[in-house]
Amino acid sequence: PSDALASTANYLAEFGWTNNQPWGIEVNLPENFNYRNADLEVKATPARWSELGLKTITGEKIPNYGEGSVFLPAGAKGPAFIVFNNFFVIKRYNNANSYAMAVGHLSDRILGGKSFHIEWPRGPGALKFNEKVELQNLLNQLGYDVGEADGIIGPNSIAAIRKFQISVGLIPDGMSNKDLLLKMRASN
């Protein structure tokens, strides 16, 4: 086990891990937040996020840990985070957003951090694989190109979902769930 931990630590260091910096911090979004900015491809300085009205969950200015991205792992109704370099370093080890967040949050908890302030939404639930394929096929049929329907909700699918959400007046958070699938079925 110690060899595995040392090996993983070396791997993370090689890919740019920054000591004494968080993977991310939970934030409050302003009511007028432009959800198109909730995208891991959109990076800004903490000062810029503060100008746009974002604050830490305790109401303070966003600390300067370098550029970060707004991450909404459960969509607009769940907790919001600004993720920094270490989040992306974890993703180099395992590219799943859920993995990077779980590892980051577990490390926070081991160091005495608290659980998330905003509860995970309880609602329509995640899509099964075949429903994800159906959602992608519907997006393609409606003119929102996701490429091949493979059941993986990646960047192309998220971008297409956002465009669909905008077209029907929903918050464009890019989340795929059963409610969205039902709305897409009705639109087709």
In which residue ranges do the predicted regions lie?
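Extracytoplasmic and endomembrane cell-envelope/extracellular-matrix remodeling and assembly machinery
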Residues: 1-137, 141-144
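Short acidic, glycine/serine/threonine-rich helix-capping segments at coil-helix boundaries
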Residues: 127-132, 140-184
